[in-house]
Regions:
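Conserved Asp/Asn-Gly motif in the active-site loop of CheY-like receiver
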Residues: 33-40, 110
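Receiver (REC) domain active-site loop signature in two-component systems and cognate sites
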Residues: 60
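Two-component/phosphorelay signaling modules centered on CheY-like receiver
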Residues: 13-34
Length: 158
């Protein structure tokens, strides 16, 4: 089975450290986490590396938030996108819904992010999945449990 490649993008170095350790611990050895501290740095990484999941802060240097994720979506439809935000507005929810992006509002526990990523992997259209992501779906199995802080496409996951 291939490795699940995750890119974390946030200008808060402490949060990136906490989340990357949490993801590696929870998702297991078949996970690789790369980090970036700005939207422009992340776009550069995306031009040279392949990622299955991108988790991005809404408010950061360089292209930020929905603009950043929209640029990724234009070139990489297969990547699962997650937005981390402290701003849960109706306008943001509409933008997230249109892009098909999962999101979590701050503050949250790293376990919530892990669960959202698993849910988004399982919910991804099987036609659009790569063989590697399909194998990851089989390995992860559908986990139970969620939180009211978990959102996908602006909808609460239950």
């Amino acid at each position: 089975m291939g490795t699940l490649n995750i890119l974390l993008v946030d200008d808060d170095r402490n949060l990136v450290t906490t989340l990357s350790h949490g993801l590696l611990k929870a998702m297991g050895e078949a996970t690789s986490v790369a980090v970036s501290f700005s939207g422009s740095e992340a776009l550069s990484l995306l031009s040279t590396q392949v990622f299955d999941v991108v988790v991005s802060d809404f408010n950061m240097p360089g292209p930020s938030g929905l603009e950043f994720l929209n640029r990724i979506r234009q070139d990489h439809r297969e990547i699962i996108l997650v937005l981390i935000t402290a701003y849960g507005t109706d306008a943001l929810e509409e933008g997230v819904r249109q892009l098909g992006v999962g999101y979590i509002t701050k503050p949250f526990e790293p376990a919530f992010l892990v669960q959202l990523i698993k849910d988004l992997i399982h919910d991804q259209d099987p036609v659009g999945r790569t063989d590697k992501v399909s194998r990851i779906v089989d390995k992860l199995g559908k986990s139970a449990g969620s939180s009211s802080s978990l959102r996908a496409g602006g909808q609460l996951l239950e």
